Amino acid sequence: MADDTDNPPNIQIPAKSYGFPPEAFDPRRLPDYDTNFLPAHDLEAFIQALAAPDFVQSPDDASSMRLNSPGLHSPSSLDITKDDYDHSEARAALASVADVAAPGGGNNHHRRTSTGTFFSAHNDWAPVSEKVIKTDRDEKRNKRGKDRKNKKPRKGVAPLRTLVGTRSKDETREGYLYSLLKWPFLLFVSFWIVGLGMAYLATRFYIYFYEQFVAWRGRREQLRRAMRATGNYKDWVAAARNMDDFFGNQRWKEENDFAYYDSKTVRRVWDQMRRCREKAEEVERELESQSQNSDSGVASGEETSNTKAGGGNNGNDKKTQPVEDLKALIEACVKNNFVGIENPRLYSQTYYGTKNLVQNYVDEVERSIKFLIDTKQLTKEQKRVMFKGICANYGRTALCLSGGATFAYYHFGVVKALLEVDYLPDIITGTSGGALVAALVATRTNDELKELLNPALAHKITACRESFTVWFWRWWKTGARFDSVDWAKQCAWWCHGSLTFREAYERTGRILNVSCVPSDPHSPTILCNYLTSPDCVIWSAVLASAAVPGILNPVVLMMKNRDGSLEPYSFGHKWKDGSLRTDIPIKSLNLHFNVNFSIVSQVNPHINLFFFSSRGSVGQPVTHRKGRGWRGGYLGSATEQYIKLDLTKWLRVLRQLELLPRPLGQDWSQLWLQTFGGTVTIWPKSIPSDFLKILSDPDPPRLARMIHEGQQSAFPKVKFIANRLKIERLVERGRRETRDRRNAANAFTATGDGEGSYASHSIVDAMGGKHPLAPSSSGGAGDRRGSIESILSEDDLRSLLIKGREGVHTSGGSSTGTEDELTMTELEGEDDDGGTSRVSEGGSRNRYFEGALEEEDGALEVAASDHSRT
């Protein structure tokens, strides 16, 4: 994280630079190195939000007393309270909170800081001042209750209860056997799990030595070292092809048959698609020749071309038949994992590439889609409907960055590898430490990222700079090692200031997602993005996603208002680390953005230890028996799988039988029982010293190694990702180019009765005060990837304005009313990204539209704006 200093840091160029040039270690070359993105008023708003009590988390705590009671803030009002002199500590705590939370904290010393206890009648008829005569029995009972209430706990008991954790009354099961057998059964299962863990480590050591001294020897070891020493993707591909030639994998590529996909169907579809495209290209050339040689000129030639494309003349039916067949074939075959062509095993038998038949099919689909985008034989409406259906069936791709403390810096290498070949997905999600990397990627353009992803970035990572004596006393007093305010100052640089999720989407076109877990163990997890929480400030979500119990206390999410000020989001509730429940939010991504192809970079240390692919993974085949064997032999792989499955079984037993306590008030069972992988899972190779430095800032040499290892782990997956993304981006291009781009400016002109003027102003107000046809003010590479002009047609906009005018007349409002008199109706429907539009909690109602209204089949649906790649 960022640490602003006036003196330039020392430049350290290690002996082993991992292919980085000397200037890559100079921090002064980093963009915005000395920029302080966090204004003082934003930081002050965050401090006040942290000081405010969380009523949901601790409604009965002394810190959650009302700050708006008449006796505290309204001296002029009728004071019907009395001082409670028995809670001096509570009054002092309340006074400190009030001083921090008040806007003019320095002028609040004269206010009353006593807590108020309101009088209440015994019933509806008894007066307030009625004298109540207490019996001796009541006095003794009240005295015993006060003594029990005022009894202080023994030293060490309260921290121990917090550390061990307890369940509430509603969560605790009843029964004598449960109470008697709970702890013995917990001890037995715990010892058994420890024994299984030791056996698993022994098995992994056996497999490691087997591969090092049996599988990798001689020439193959030299080729592997040469491949791991490469610093860019081009050199890696050359080294990977040498490995394939040595192991004879080329013969496997030439054979079409394979058990994990339908080779016969792929071959038939490929031949038919190629023939249809070639015939359609011949017809296209004939139409272009007729258009150029026409006696009536260019205009009549275009009209003739459009007439032929419409298929209205019987003489042209044969000419339009090839393109119709090609269109039908593309609609039927361009689907997610069609007949198994996206099976990871197709890319797990070689170091580079896949079956020649599969590669030919992918290349032919790419050429056919390009032809359908540019052809004149289909109308724009036909193309629009076609690409809309293909987009829904094919889905989208997302890059998921896991948590893992300082292990998360391996993500820099993964992002750098994908950025080098221009295959970085537009949808990015991060959790805990991965959220910090995802925020950096989603708030910077490609050109900025290429300058940032260097070892010099280590000079901005200073979150763990404090000495042991400093952070230990903070942990002893507050229960957290790090300070939330200090992390907010540093995190703002990584998030490019107080950008919201919507503003980051506008700046780079990338969709950032951050997982956050509420402090309440039973409340649902939230996935922050520009749809669910558009006005939420990114750096606050990153802090919340990194708030591991014991490391960082839960924090408040912040929301940006229309005037740029910050205030607490979601009623001031506090949130914490998202990896405790959903490290990889696959289901939420599919719900909001139709993601069905996930690239997961997994670096969690407690998960990385248990990763083992007995049959090889994408770009990393098994060397034993030419890819048809088992890693470590069959006995080693079978033992590893059995122990790992048995460990999972006993962890589920602990959770289902409610045997586990809740240390620090958190259910930790999900740490091992989640889904941690995706369609493609990248596992950067760590070293033992990373576990010792799990909460230590990396220096430039260490960060250079982590970036290099991240690249090396991502290079084998690039070919698989490339075959997926090049088709997906062509489909997005077809969607973008087939939308109606006619000028919608005339829809904003005022009509005679002034209704058009009012409707246009309401649209401008809904867009945050910016005209939809106004150019972007950011300029350069930072421009957003699309504009409302490119996604909103004239007819759609007129329909929108008519709906707005009808709403005004129905409510009886005037055409000259203010923006508060016109509320926007929530539109529910399927958007282009497969998600559902909704009014998010804490979002402003008068924001501009993120999608265009398309009227099709008599129904309105909200279409999210697609953006062209920067």
From Swiss-Prot:
PROSITE patterns: PNPLA. It comes from the Eukaryota. InterPro entries: Acyl_Trfase/lysoPLipase, NTE, PNPLA_dom, Triacylglycerol_lipase_N. Residues 818-834 have a biased composition (Acidic residues). Residues 142-155 have a biased composition (Basic residues). Residues 289-308 have a biased composition (Polar residues). A motif (GXSXG) lies at residues 430-434. GO terms for cellular component: membrane. One of its GO terms (molecular function) is triacylglycerol lipase activity. Keywords: Hydrolase, Lipid degradation, Lipid metabolism, Membrane, Transmembrane, Transmembrane helix. The active site is at S432, D577. The chain crosses the membrane at residues 183-203. CDD domains: Pat_PLPL. GO terms for biological process: lipid catabolic process; triglyceride metabolic process. It is found in: Membrane. Pfam families: DUF3336 (PF11815), Patatin (PF01734). Its EC number is 3.1.1.-. Belongs to the PLPL family. PANTHER family: NEUROPATHY TARGET ESTERASE/SWISS CHEESE D.MELANOGASTER, TRIACYLGLYCEROL LIPASE PTL2. Probable lipid hydrolase. This is Patatin-like phospholipase domain-containing protein NCU11180. It comes from Neurospora crassa (strain ATCC 24698 / 74-OR23-1A / CBS 708.71 / DSM 1257 / FGSC 987).
